[in-house]
C-alpha cells in the first residue's frame, strides 16, 4: 500500500493512495482533515481490538471505517446500492468506494500522516 502526502497552496494536507486503496486516502481527506483526536481514537480502538474477536466502527459524513483485530475496511457511506438502482448493463465502479487492508499497514499510514502534519 503506497501513499503520498501533499500540501495544497492553502496548506491543507491531501493524501494520495495507491490503486485499490484510494478510498483510504479519501477517508483521510474527508473525515480526518488533520483531526489528530480522531486518529487517537482509531489507534486506541486498534490496541483494544488486538487479539480479540470484537470489531469497531466509526461512521463519518462520507466514509465509515470498520476494524477488527486483523483488518481495516473503509467504505463510502453511499455504497448501499440495490440491484434495482442500476441501469441494465451498467456496473458500479467501487474501487474508490471500498478498501480493505491490514491493521498494521493502516496504522503505519496513520503514524506517517501524523508525522507529516506535525512537520509544519
Curated annotation (Swiss-Prot):
The protein's superkingdom reads: Bacteria
Pfam families the record matches: UPF0231
Which InterPro entries does its entry note? UPF0231
HAMAP family the record matches:
UPF0231 (MF_01053)
Q: Which family does it belong to?
A: Belongs to the UPF0231 family.
- NCBIfam families this protein is in? PRK05248.1-1 (NF003574), PRK05248.1-3 (NF003576)
Q: What is this protein called?
A: UPF0231 protein CKO_03249
Taxonomic lineage is:
Bacteria, Pseudomonadati, Pseudomonadota, Gammaproteobacteria, Enterobacterales
Amino acid at each position: 500500500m503506497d501513499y503520498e502526502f501533499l500540501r495544497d497552496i492553502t496548506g491543507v494536507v491531501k493524501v494520495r493512495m495507491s490503486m485499490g486503496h484510494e478510498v483510504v486516502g479519501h477517508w483521510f481527506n474527508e473525515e480526518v482533515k488533520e483531526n489528530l483526536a480522531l486518529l487517537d481514537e482509531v489507534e486506541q480502538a486498534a490496541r483494544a481490538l488486538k487479539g480479540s474477536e470484537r470489531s469497531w466502527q466509526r461512521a463519518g459524513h462520507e466514509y465509515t471505517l470498520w476494524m477488527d483485530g486483523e483488518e481495516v475496511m473503509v467504505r463510502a457511506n453511499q455504497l448501499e446500492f440495490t440491484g434495482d438502482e442500476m441501469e441494465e448493463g451498467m456496473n458500479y465502479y467501487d474501487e474508490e468506494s471500498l478498501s480493505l487492508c491490514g491493521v498494521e499497514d493502516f496504522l503505519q499510514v496513520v503514524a506517517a500522516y501524523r508525522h507529516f502534519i506535525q512537520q509544519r
